[in-house]
Structures are given as structure tokens and as C-alpha cells.
Amino acid sequence: MLRVGRDSIDFLDHYDVVVVGGGHSGCEAALAAARLGCNTLMLTLNLDKIAWQPCNPAVGGPAKSQLVHEIDALGGEMGKVTDRTYLQKRVLNRSRGPAVWALRAQTDKREYARVMRSVVENQPNLTIREGTVTDLVLGRNDEVVGVVTHFGTIFGCRAVILTTGTFLGGRIWIGRHWQAAGRAGEFAVEGLTDTLRQLGFETGRLKTGTPARVDRRSVDFSVMERQPGDPDVRWFSFDPEVWVPREQMDCYLTRTTPETHRIIRENLHETPVYGGWVEAKGPRYCPSIEDKIVRFADKESHQIFIEPEGRDLPELYIQGFSTGMPEKIQIQMLRSLPGLERCVMLRPAYAVEYDYLPATQLYPTLMTKKVQGLFCAGQINGTTGYEEAAAQGLIAGINAARLVQGKPLVTLPRESSYIGTLIDDLCTKELREPYRMLTSRSEYRLILRSDNADQRLTPLGREWGLIDDRRWALFQAKQARIAAEIERLETQRVKAHDLAGIQLSQLTGQGIKGSATLAEILRRNQIHYSDLLELGLGDAELDPFEQEAAEIAVKYSGYIQRQQSQIEQVSKQYHRPLPPDLDYHSIPTLSKESRDKLSAVRPLTVGQAARIGGVNPADINALLIYLEVRQRQRAADPVCSSL
């Protein structure tokens, strides 16, 4: 670690912001900082692997699609690139309520990376360069002022964003054999973890993995279940300019067999985890196939999805089949699956372990508590998934730019967005396994839907400087049309004896007493906006997404209002700030565990304190009483300093 005033430092060049890493988090961070006017440098190990999808070439899914919609609503890029490069799109959970609808896109991995690279290469204020950052430069006040590459090149800056993915101390495993690498064929980053430890950061190890890739020409699809895309394509971006209708490709479904399970059980000792060579925790919600066989021993079979990696690629991704087995056993496992009896493996599966920083060492702005100007985003914070990484990168990029420009840093409350929920969880909970976003993690999922992400967040994106005039005009016009339609539905009435009233009564099996508004009718379970259109009672000039938004707002208005009231009640206490210098050990009514946890995490609000593991509701009540007493004593005696 270099220090200004102690070491001789020869800066090659100076930037406002340096982003370390060119993955999904790094791209969003670099684009945000550059678009906000900062002279930005993105350093990445390999320019040809910018925005690479090393595991599943897919974007979205439960909770993840909400993140992508929110990234787009704030002015990020992931949704736009996905809409331009998808191979297939499907809405998951469509039979359930809109709170859990999840758009998922299979993407062309090479095209996705190529399009995103073109975006970053052509972004004003953004320079991209190959380089491996192994050290930091600190200023006289322990603030970050630069980075050092493996070959000794030093770049000066006022903010650094670490988006190191799985490369920080990365090690990939196939059976008993390992290699220092962040991904197959790419070097690991050594040295940076040591610098972070010297600065007092706690670090840990996590594990993830990726399945084998097989040659599509060696696969028999006729014995598998076809999984086509949805005919009515939906979009991640709220900007119609990037909507590109494309021919869709099929995915396929097969299943494990008793032979698959036998091979795995007999060879568990050959895997890095069960063999005892890797102790790092893997992702609970994306387990290896051997973990599934062990944890769900009573299940006779597991679903395996066969997914294309590109239009012009012969490679198929075997979703749900990641493993750390030796290659010879991997081939046996693959050939035990129906349709893959004669498959040719092009790339073996492998496990990867890497260093991370528990994110309780960060503020919700994603700046570290120990070093001014140092931000972390993505897998270095303990998350798994492209979408989680991109969301963090966007917020880190915004805040790095605001720090450089002398503006107050910004946060998203957990009740405002899935991004806010994600970051709040990371910064307050002691996570010892890779974190994946789930709809169940949000207490407010009825309000935090995909369809209204722009309504919730685009005004913030505009305020922060990432939504341009064209997007803002589109947003305002759309919201005006939806609001006008909701008002029309709430006021236009249908009489019981009218033809439309009779037809609606027949459709729902419920009569109309005198008359009813269209909104009252739309709230009936059997009625949808499409029914109103068929009867000439809808607005055909609205696009389908505006019609859907109006229907959801009307149909679920009672539930939405109740949840909004809950948020307002909780916010009164949970948004109450906590003094940064509060001595928790001096509060005798707190349990010892909560005093230790609160002192370690240093939450900024009562709400954050309540979500720390080991801090129970009784502790929060004791803390609120203490704050109330402290406030009264200080009001009575302004010079009181005893508390």
C-alpha cells in the first residue's frame, strides 16, 4: 500500500473515478460516473470479456427482473442491452399476482458482451483499459487517491470502485485439482486482498460454480420437453427505442435419473467441498447438483434445463447441473440424462472460490466506512448474480460521482425498491454465504413491482442526472395517460340494464345493482382490462403495458393503500437517525449481543439496527426509549453531555 507523503509516487494519469473490473457491476458503475460528468477510467483484466456472462447467459427471473427494471428506471444499461440481445423471453409466475411476475431472458452471451462493450467504448468521459489492480494509494488523511497495477503503473483519482467479481484471490477447482483463476482461462488478482486487510477490513471466502457446456449437435432434443418463449414479448427497458423484436429460440427440459444420482453419491469424495479441500460457503439458492442430491435425498429426480448460449454457437448451457466433479465423472453424469446419452462436452464444469468483504463494512451508499472514496460493488460484497451486481454498480457509480462533485451521497430505502432492499440487507446482516435477491426478502413486494419501477424511481434518476430530456418526456406522457385512464375507470359508470352491464353480469356471474363504475367491475376476480376492451369499455389507444398498469392500480388499490399505510407507520420510527458516535456499550438495557453487534455494524437508522442479526425487538424498544430519554434530557439541559 502506497501513501502520499511517505512513498515516492509517479502517477501516469489522473481521473475523477477509477472502476476496477469490467463485469456487470463495473459497466454500470463506470457508465453512471461518466454520464454524471466525471472523467472515468475502467480497468479490466481483458477488454474482450467486458460484461461477459461466465455462468448462465440469462438476465432476470424472480426478484432479479425487478432489479433490472429498477436499474433501467434509474438510467442504467442492463435492461437495454438485454432487450437488444435476447434469444428467448418468458414471464415466470404468471398464474400468480403481479407482485411476483418475473420476466426472464435467455441472452446471446457474445452479442450481449459485444453490445455492452460498444456502449462503454462510445460513452463520453469514459476510458477503458486493460490492467490488473493489485494495490491502492492513500492520501494524507487515509482517503483513496489512486490505484496501482500489477506492472507498477499508478493512476491518480478521487474515488475508486472495486467490482472484482470472483477474481479476488480466485481459485477454480475440478475434482482434486485447482488453478489460480477468477474464471476458466483468466488470471486471479493477487495482492489487493492483502492491502484491504492491512487497512483493517475483514475478508472471507465464498464459493460458486458453473455447469458444463455441451455441443448441441450431439444432443437428442426429441426426448426432452420443449420450452418455447412467450409469444407476447415483454421488455426490461421502459424506453421503446431499444425494443428489438427478435426470432426466439427454444430451451428444453430434461431430468436427472437414478443412474445420475448413483454416480454422484458414489463419487462425492471427489468433489472439492465433500472432499474437504474447499470450506467456502456456496450459494444456498443455486446449489451444485451434488448438493441437491445430498440435501434432497428423498427426491427421485431434479429438473435440468438445456439452454442455448448464442444463435451462432454450438454450446448449450446445462442449467441446474453445476459441479466440481472430475471431468471423467462429469461426462458420465451428463450421459445419464435423457437426451444427452451421446453428448460431447465442450467445457467442463468447475467450482470457484474467491475473497469477499462482508458488506457490513460499507455504508448504504456503498462507500467503505474505513476509507473515504473507496466503494465496493458486486460479488466482492458477497452477492451472486449479474443483476445484483449491476444494481450495486449503478448506486456505487452514482455516489462516487457525487463524492467527487461535492454533492451529498444518496441511498435507496428498502421500502422504495428491490435495490434498496438488497443494499440494506448487505449492509446490516451478517451474510456468510452468497446473497441472492428473492421476492420474499422484500416486505413491500406488492408496491415494488416490475411494472411500476419507472413510476417509483425515474423521478430519482432524473433528479440524480441519469434520465435525459427524451426519457423524461416519455415518462411524463406515459404516467399522464395511466393517471387519466385510472380516473376514467373510477368515474365512468355502467348501468345494470345497459347491454354492456348485462354482458358484464353474465361474464362475472354477479349482477350490477343499479350502476357501477368500471373500476368496481374491474376489481372483480373474473374481469380483466382485456374484457373491457372487447366490450368497447377500454381505451384501445393505450399500449398494452399502460392498460396493464391501470388495471393493476385499480384491481389492487385496497391492498396497495394498506401496504403504503404500513410503510408510512414503520418509516416514522425506522427512518429515525442514530448518532454516529452513539456508545452502545453504555446502554445497560441492551443485551450484550446486541451491544456488540450494534457497535460493530454502526447502523445509521433505527430500521437498519432492527435488521441486524442478534438484535431483537426488545433491544429496539430499549434503544428507542434510550433515545427518547436522551432527547428529553438534552432539551431540558442543552449543555448536558452526560449521555
UniProtKB/Swiss-Prot annotation:
One term under GO cellular component: cytoplasm
Cofactor(s) annotated in UniProt: FAD
Gene Ontology molecular functions: flavin adenine dinucleotide binding
InterPro entries xref list: FAD/NAD-bd_sf, GIDA_C_N, MnmG, MnmG-rel, MnmG-rel_CS, MnmG_C, MnmG_C_subdom, MnmG_C_subdom_sf
GO terms under biological process: tRNA methylation; tRNA wobble uridine modification
Binding residues for NAD(+): 282-296
Keyword Coiled coil appears in the UniProt entry: no
Keywords: Cytoplasm, FAD, Flavoprotein, NAD, tRNA processing
Protein residues bound to FAD: 21-26
Primary site of residence: cytoplasm
Functional note: NAD-binding protein involved in the addition of a carboxymethylaminomethyl (cmnm) group at the wobble position (U34) of certain tRNAs, forming tRNA-cmnm(5)s(2)U34.
Oligomer and partners: Homodimer. Heterotetramer of two MnmE and two MnmG subunits.
NCBIfam families per UniProt: mnmG_gidA
Name assigned to this protein: tRNA uridine 5-carboxymethylaminomethyl modification enzyme MnmG
